[in-house]
Structures are given as structure tokens and as C-alpha cells.
């Protein structure tokens, strides 16, 4: 059956910003879907608010709208573009919920838009807990005993009836948001109250707990004619009770008997048939390990996180096939692009083991509750492939980049036996390491199984690793022992640590012994058919399947798992680098381990290696590929930059900016000397290797000071301290300082922060744009609202920034990208830091300027000059030009009629016990973009897209630190003048009344009921403005207020600058005033 002819133009809804529970997998799925639809001759319109995605590039869809994903904005896009079809199942829960809202509001009917793919009735039956349960009963599929509740009282009544523990699952939410496991009445009331608030239909499912049962998933695909296949079975190592996004997952399932597999596979196919799914779908089961009994947990009637994993694990392009099914094609008509010969109706076969391990943000949020449950907490994930379970497991562990290359964990090793057993009993992010430690201490596999409910098969695999640790420690390192250790997944570094050798010495010995990895192919058919676009994984087996054709080739290092501080923005640059190398006639070879990303899609590069980003693993690929031009490190974030020096020392050429120049930018002493030579000021500071040295530096330069370890990224453990007592407390509590781990102490200037991204060839520098941060220095740049072009800088300040940026880029001989951050204090411009690599603002500037930074940087790295590429300040209409004897720098032309605002997005609701106050340490997980003719409208769009919905009337709570009171008075007066009611804590209320601003006093927690948290819970406060007093103790009023507000969906602003931005919007836009839309194609 050919594709349907009644549809020529299709609207695809993206998934918006990255939050916990919805990460890069939807950029990968959406990008693949847009390409698939255009292959079928359709015009594609896309709406997505996330500028960091490949999906929102101008060439991916015919019309790209980076606008808030709300019913009003999607309707405006539909009214303008008049698509005949809407594809909602590739934008995660956001896309699905939006389709439901548009249908219910009559928008789709009004504009004659047909829903493509899985019908709305099927979506509703899968997502609505009551309808789903009724359908399962109808087709004879077992579901746990449960109740649909719309009030906490109904949930408590069910709890009384069936007993605890019970699992709470809110309807239509993402990543288990608002859900949890209730062990008693108190927990039930808390979880259900929150869950009902977060469910768009105010509905929760409360079900009997199946804790301890195995969790098994099937990724299935069905077309409109009823043909269906299973693509992959997946088994969660963690039993039921831990969200699948937080579980270690193995594919294919390892512990099922053939009979169990056939029963569950048949059930999955029966369920999607009964639902009438058209496209990809994920079915989750609980399987009783002690009897042949199973329960259906839930169905995701859309492409999901598990789809991305199944897709990368099998080589089957799920999103592409789902998009083609949505426009009427059948499975037996869709060619599998991986093999080029088989069709999509062919079920994948796997002859290897795939493991996914989640990446958690607990290194950033040390106070967060690390217990894992039904509400997801991971920010990203890694995937590893090997022939054996232990081999894939250890490969995945070292892909996580948590400083551990094996199953040794100092914090776990320090636990006493009782605490270790508790760690085994309670699911948490360190349980894998606890299992290994328990085995080392002689705890048996049956005992660990009884405590953790982890299947003995997996425990035996971990036991094999522990046994090899012992064998390596006890005996000589023979060639036979080396080979067995490598087959179990041990890295050279892990072997070296056990036997007391340097990792490179282990490598040399291993190569002398002839113990080398081979590379195997992922091709979706276990080698039955030749693959047209293969990708590879390493293992210590016999036959090498990798083919490395001669010719020019270069390696692009990816950025690994998504985590706070290193997100999808870096994958964006790596993808553009791979594409541009191809265009230059250079074979692009990508190494990465993140299954969610576009960089690990089968057709992004010429060859893909799914490997950890460590020196050993990268060198193995370089050796396999033979004569390469070099490795590009500057697009993979800090992950790739950290490999530049070790690779260079190992004799591998690092392409782009010279290693020594990168060190000049990173090394404190050399960087200070560079700035001194160039006469460019920076805030005074120094390096300390002891507490007393830090105190001496602070006394010399004056308080407040910004202190941070010199060896971390993403602002980790960075803090502003205001006096000596705070400094001593920080040095004592936050970090271990020593001669090889110095602390940087800088004078903190409370000024405006500005940053630039530049591309340089060593002779010419293009400053792509100057971005102004709305929050003052002291809030991490990734957590600030950024505005382009600048709105408050003077012409002289802009000239100075262009001059400084040019001189720095030329002095460092930058070849490719460089990001420079400045602070303006007392009219003077100071350099804060220089990063000679791609930055998280590259996708944002690429979208709004039209200058494809990563592409141009790759052309420069490939050997072109900017002049050869046609970039010239005189011909390009440069906004500002600065010339020196060494070369010229110029500011890319700025739009006269547009302002762009990038706003951060946080995942506070998923992480309990985390302070929401902004600081020098980055906390946001994603970003959105608002673009319009002026700042208030662009800001409005960005705030709306980021989830900050401030009502045009209501009550504002002011509770601010003493040092902020004077400044807060002006803001409070503006809110009051706009008609808001002001309430404040005692000190702030007194200050407001002294300024004749009407304000009512409210109680702090310690002052008795009703206190501020009670008012928030009762819905009597609409906006909280709260700045940080000293200290972040979880028992302090400020912390409790901020957490209560976040958990009850009340917008909370912890920076007066953000509050000022909100006021700009409120005072400029009338309630209900319509704001226009524009497509990326119209911007430049």
C-alpha cells in the first residue's frame, strides 16, 4: 500500500527542553522522523522550543518553529501552515499530551488536521489508567489489583482495603513524575496529593506492589494493516519498583526461559493489536520469579527512551519506521536502511549483550535523596555492547565518567557490614558497587539475591568479575590471564591498579602478548545479511569484522552521557563536525556511548564505534582505523578535551587548536601571564594549597571571593563566600585541598556577565555574537537567562569585548571554536575564563545568527582559512572590526528586528531535598529559546517555554537576605503598582512598610502556623521571590520555602535579576495579548 495521498504537509511536535525523564532520545527520534517523512515527498513543519537540538536546524524540516509548546502557540502554527496531518508520537509525553489537548479543544477539527500514526482512541486507552485497566480485563491480560483515584481520601481507603506498600502512578506524566511507593498512610497522602497536582487529568493509579518481581520490556512495532513484530526484549536488572529509566537494563533479556519469552512476546503483540497502535510502542511486564505468572505494568503508545535504547541495541531505526507507518506504509514496504536489502518486517536478531546504565546527577546534588523508586532521577545514560554480560557491564561502568573504571567504590568500601546490607536492600545509584563489595566480603549469591531481589544470573556475572580481581591480585600477569581479564571487560587502568602497574605499561605488555581487541558489527540481523551502514563494538574474540577503507579520515569524539553541565549542546556540535567531514571528502569516524543522541545514529558518520571515551578505548579505535589525519576533541565537551593531552602523548595528532595553547588557557599561572602580556584585566585572585593560604589570598584581594576546586567542570563545588568564617567552613566541608588539588580564590565582582563564541583560523576571528546574561555574575552561565543581541552594553564596551576576544583568540592560535566569558564591574571589562572548545551556547547562536559555527570550525580544522571560505568583514557587513598586526577580528552582523532569549530549564520536581537557589554551580538540565521583535516578547516566550508561568494577578511572597533588601524594595513597589498583593517575612515586611509599600507579614516555619509552607500548600501564594541567606542547611526557612514552592508548582525566583526580567514581561504585555510566531527559515 503506497503512502496516503490525502496528506502533503505534516506537523511534528517536538519534546521541548531536556528534563529528567525526557532527554536527547526525542531529538534523535524527531530528526530521524523528519528525514523519513521528507523521503516520502512530504513537507514537514516542526514546533519545538529547544534550540540545542539537531531537529530544530533549518535543513531538518521545511518550516521550523522554535516556539513554546502550548496549545495557543501550536494552534498559531497550524493556522499559519495549514498541515493536513499531525504526528504526535515522536515528541515524548509532551507531544502526546499536546495532541490530546488540541483534540479536546476542537483545534484539530477546526483546521481539518488528521492525527497520523497511533489513533487518539489508542493513546487514550493506553494513557488513561481506568481505560487501560478495562481493556486488559477485556482481552484477558492480567493487571495488578488497583484503584483509580482523584482524591487522597480515595487512595487512603484503597490502602486500608489491600494493605501497603502500594505504587502510585499519576496519569499522563513523564518519567514517573509525581509517583512513588507508599509504605504507610502518611506517605500515601503526600505522594497522591503531589501526583494529582502534577497529572493533567488529576488522576492517579494506586496499585498493589509487585516489588521484587522481574521487570521485562518489549519494544514492538505495528502497522496500519495489523502486521506486528517485536524488535527487542529488555530486562531490568533492578526488580519492579525502580523506574526503568533509573534501572540498569540488559538487552536481549538474559534470564527468561524460552517459554516465558514466548508468553510475554505473544502478550505484547496481543496488547498492541487490541490498542490499535500504528507505529512504535513499549510494553512493560512484571514477571514473578518464583512462578510462571506475569502482570502488565503499562504501555507507552509512542517512541520512548526504551525505543532509543532498542534502536541502538539492534540497529533497527524505530523512529524512522514509525514515521513511515504513520503516513500509511506497511512494514513489508519499508526498507531497513542499515542492511539496505531487508525490510522492516524482519525481526532483529542479536548475537551480543547490550547494557544501559543510567547517569545520575548526585555528584552535583550531594544532598539529594539517592533512593531509587518509581519517579525517575537520572539525567542521561550510557550503553555498552560486548559478547558477555560482565564485559558489557564493565564497559558501561567506565563510560559513565564518574571516576570509576571498575566495581571498586571507596565510599561503599568504607561501609560496615550492616550498612552494606542496607545498601543492598534499598535500591540506589550505588547498589551495583555494593553487590561487588558484598561478594568481596564473602556474602553469598543467594544471600545477596534475598536482600536485593536481583536475579542470580546477574549476580554470578558480577561474582566472575570479583573472582578475576582476586586472581589478578594473587598471581602473575600471564598472557592467558590477561586475555581472560580483558574478555571480562577489565580496562588496562583497572588491571594496572590491581597489579600495581601504570595503565600505559599494561597496554604495552598486553600488545607484546598479542592480546588485542577485535571489532564486531551491529547490523540488526546477527550477520545474516551484509550491512550497508555498520557500526561496531570491541571485544576480545577471534574474528575482526571491522572494515577500514583507505583514504582521508578523522575521528570525532562525542561527549558521552547527558549530565548537568554537559548536555545535548555538545552532541549538536559533534554531529555537525561528522557531517562536515563527510562533505569535505574525509571519512568521519565517531566514538561515543550515548544511545539517546543523533551522533550515535547509524547514518550520522561514515563509521560509528560504540565505545567508552577513555584513552585505552579511543587508542584501540585509532589503531583499528590505521592512518588517520587525527582526532577532533573540541566538540565533545570536557569529556573529549580531557583526552587531548593523553592522546597527544600517545602519539596521536589532535586536530584544531594546539595542545600547548589549550594548556595556556587552562593553567592558572600561564593564563595570568598571557593576560598580563596582552594587558587584559581579570579579577584579582590566587591559588591555595591549604586553608591558611586561601585565607591569606582572600585577605589580600578582599571579600567577597569566589572559591572553586581547580579540577572540576560545570561549576561543581563552586561558591561565593563573604567573610573569613564562611571561607574556613567551605574549605573544611566542601573540598579536600592539597598541593596536587589546589583551590582557586578570586575576587567576586557583582557585575554583568557577558559571553562570546568565536571561530578562528589563527589569522582571522569571527565573533559570532555577544550574549548578555540577565543574572549577574555568581549565577552559573548555564543557569542564566542569556539575551542576544545585547541590550544594555555601550558601544565602547562592545568594541572592547571584540578587541579582547580577537587578541585572545589570536594569541592562543585558536583553530576552531573558543568561548570567552567576561564580567563588567565598575565600567571595566574583566576576563573570567577562556575555553578553547565548543560551548553550550553554540547551537543557540547558530540558530539566531545563521552562522553555522560547528560547521565552519570543522572546515577550519580540515585546513581551510576563513578567507578561503568567503568570510570577510568588509563583504559580510561586520558590526564591529578590530585589526592587529597578527590578524583581524570582527563581530558577525546582528539582527536589527529580532531579540533572542535563551532560558534555563530545571528538573527540581524529580529531585527531592535539592536546594533550588541559583549559584555558581550549574543546576539546569535543559534550555529553551524565545525569539521576537523586542525583549519583553522574547522573554515572555522563553519564560513560558521554560515552565515559568507567572499569573497577571495574585499574591507575591518576598523573603530576601539583608544585603538584597534595598534593591528588592523597587521590585516590590513595581509588583504592588501592577496590582499584586505583597506578603513578606518579618524583616522584609518591616523594610517594605518603611518604604510605604503595602505588605502583610507572614510566619516563618519557626513562628508557628499558618507558616509560609502552609500558605503555599493551600494555594494562597502565586509567586515566591527568595534570595539566599548564608548557608544552605535543609532545616533553614529559605530551603523549606523553596522546596515547598517547587513541589507545589509555584514559580520561585532566587535571583532579583530574574524577578526584574519577569516584571519586564508583566509590565509590557497585557493579559491575553497575542504574541506572533516566526519560522527559523525567516530569521536569517
UniProtKB/Swiss-Prot annotation:
Residues 948-1084 are annotated as: Allosteric domain. Disulfide bonds: none annotated. Mg(2+) 1 binds at residues 284, 298. Mn(2+) 3 binds at residues 821, 833. GO terms for molecular function: ATP binding; carbamoyl-phosphate synthase (ammonia) activity; carbamoyl-phosphate synthase (glutamine-hydrolyzing) activity; metal ion binding. Residues 948-1084 form the MGS-like domain. Mn(2+) 2 binds at residues 298, 300. One of its GO terms (cellular component) is cytoplasm. Its EC number is 6.3.4.16, 6.3.5.5. Mn(2+) 4 binds at residues 833, 835. It catalyses: hydrogencarbonate + L-glutamine + 2 ATP + H2O = carbamoyl phosphate + L-glutamate + 2 ADP + phosphate + 2 H(+). PANTHER family: CARBAMOYL-PHOSPHATE SYNTHASE [AMMONIA], MITOCHONDRIAL, CARBAMOYLTRANSFERASE FAMILY MEMBER. This is Carbamoyl phosphate synthase large chain. The gene is carB.
